[in-house]
């Protein structure tokens, strides 16, 4: 919420050049998350998640305080980059704490509330009008005070979360992962030199090859435990998480209504984004409750139907309508579908995973989420199109390519969900036979 307001305020005060710098920092923050979150999560078997949570809160507090200091747009971009690191730490740590402290029968509802925190924060930003230069500073002071309070609570509460492994941390695997993913991210972003691209590709290939060999050698003690990679349910759920976050970032739901209003020379309204985030806030806990009640398949189907209907309705209304009514319906359905699927997928990826493997799978899950966001932004910027508003889609060949991409992504998402449900049904049947 804070970073969104920060970008808007500085874009107004400093012009397009400053906004471009901040957009760079936003993308760089997503890349930092992809590179580091798995390593941070894997350390959760050696260092208590509350320690990571405290570290993330300290970083967030410092970056929030730094954003209040007047300075150049470049300085502010670095503040946002550090903020992304702190947010990543708190995301991983809070997930691990929720998973370790919740019995399996109540894990769906807990994950539902955990997923709901994002739309809650974004909804608060819209209601409080954090994009206003007049409101941004007092809201920032409030966020800083809340961060300090939560940090004090974390430091003073007893630590009950699971920590335990007799294996030493796979430092070699962690270094290989950092090098490989960093090289791959640089390869995707950098356009300056074909020679550099070849070098980065070779570095990434060698690093991932060495990581594969290291994983085979260390087995369950590797950075990515070997047995996790042999679980089709986990792999399918990770793929689906990546596809979902790709679709969300590629479609750019947050700003669709703003561009729609500008295109029609209307004043942007807060109602459409409020509808998007409010629907996500409500449906996430509901999806978690239904999962705990044994309605997993219903949640998966409901999420896909809501998302497809929401995207279709939003695209149609953005192309033809001159009122917000249809747009509101599309964003309501989209927000509900996104949150419903997110809860289902995060639950699916952890189902049947042992406590020792939670850190590995948790790290992979948040990494998959960040990866989908990076790839979605990358494709959207390179294609120079906006799916929902129709910008850049006038040419028939471009439109056909984008439609084909969306069809493939939805097919991948549906296929991954089908694999998850079939594998889970097979496991349930075997457990019933054994009983």
Predicted regions mapped to residue ranges:
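Loop-to-transmembrane helix entry/capping segments in MFS-fold secondary transporters
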Residues: 19-20, 104-114, 353-365
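Central cavity-lining transmembrane alpha-helices of secondary-active solute carriers
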Residues: 24-42, 91, 95, 274-287
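Helix-loop-helix hairpins in multi-pass membrane proteins, especially solute transporters
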Residues: 37-41, 45-171
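Transmembrane alpha-helical cores of Major Facilitator Superfamily
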Residues: 24-31, 58, 112-120, 243, ...
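Glycine/proline-centered helix-kink
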Residues: 113, 118-130, 181, 253, ...
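12-transmembrane solute porter fold
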Residues: 1-7, 63, 221-426
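Extracellular/periplasmic helix-loop-helix junction of adjacent transmembrane segments
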Residues: 3-36
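Hydrophobic transmembrane-helix bundles of small-molecule transporters
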Residues: 131-240, 248
């Amino acid at each position: 919420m804070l970073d969104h307001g920060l970008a808007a305020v500085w874009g107004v005060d400093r012009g397009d050049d400053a906004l471009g710098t901040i957009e760079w920092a936003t993308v760089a923050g997503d890349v930092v998350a992809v590179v580091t979150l798995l390593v941070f999560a894997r350390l959760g078997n050696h260092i208590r998640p509350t320690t990571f949570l405290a570290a993330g809160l300290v970083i967030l507090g410092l970056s929030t305080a730094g954003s209040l200091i007047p300075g150049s747009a470049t300085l502010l971009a670095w503040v946002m980059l550090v903020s992304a690191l702190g947010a990543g730490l708190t995301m991983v740590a809070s997930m691990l704490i929720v998973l370790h402290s919740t019995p399996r029968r109540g894990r769906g509802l807990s994950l539902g509330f955990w997923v709901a925190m994002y739309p809650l924060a974004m909804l608060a930003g819209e209601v409080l009008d954090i994009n206003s230069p007049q409101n941004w500073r007092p809201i920032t002071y409030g966020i800083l005070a809340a961060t300090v309070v939560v940090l004090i609570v974390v430091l003073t509460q007893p630590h009950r979360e699971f920590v335990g492994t007799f294996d030493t941390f796979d430092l070699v695997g962690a270094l290989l992962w950092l090098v490989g993913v960093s090289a791959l991210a640089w390869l995707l972003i950098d356009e300056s030199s074909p020679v550099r691209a070849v070098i980065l590709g070779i570095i990434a290939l060698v690093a991932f090859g060495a990581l594969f060999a290291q994983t085979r050698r260390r087995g369950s003690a590797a950075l990515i435990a070997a047995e996790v990679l042999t679980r089709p349910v986990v792999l399918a759920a990770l793929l689906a998480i990546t596809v979902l976050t790709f679709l969300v970032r590629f479609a750019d739901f947050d700003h669709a209504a703003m561009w729609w209003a500008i295109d029609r020379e209307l004043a942007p309204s807060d109602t459409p984004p409020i509808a998007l985030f409010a629907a996500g806030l409500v449906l996430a806990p509901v999806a978690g409750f239904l999962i705990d009640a044994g309605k997993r398949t219903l949640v998966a189907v409901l999420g896909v139907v809501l998302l497809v209907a929401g995207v279709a309705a939003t695209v149609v209304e953005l192309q033809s309508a001159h009122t917000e009514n249809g747009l509101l319906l599309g964003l309501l359905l989209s927000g509900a579908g996104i949150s419903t699927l997110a809860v289902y997928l995060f639950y699916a990826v952890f189902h049947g995973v042992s406590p020792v493997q939670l850190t590995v799978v948790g790290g992979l899950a948040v990494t998959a989420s960040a990866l989908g966001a990076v790839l979605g932004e990358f494709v959207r910027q390179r294609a120079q199109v906006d799916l929902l508003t129709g910008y850049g889609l006038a040419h028939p060949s471009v439109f056909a390519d984008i439609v084909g991409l969306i069809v493939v992504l939805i097919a991948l998402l549906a296929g991954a969900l089908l694999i998850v449900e079939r594998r889970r049904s097979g496991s349930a049947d075997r457990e019933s036979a054994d009983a």
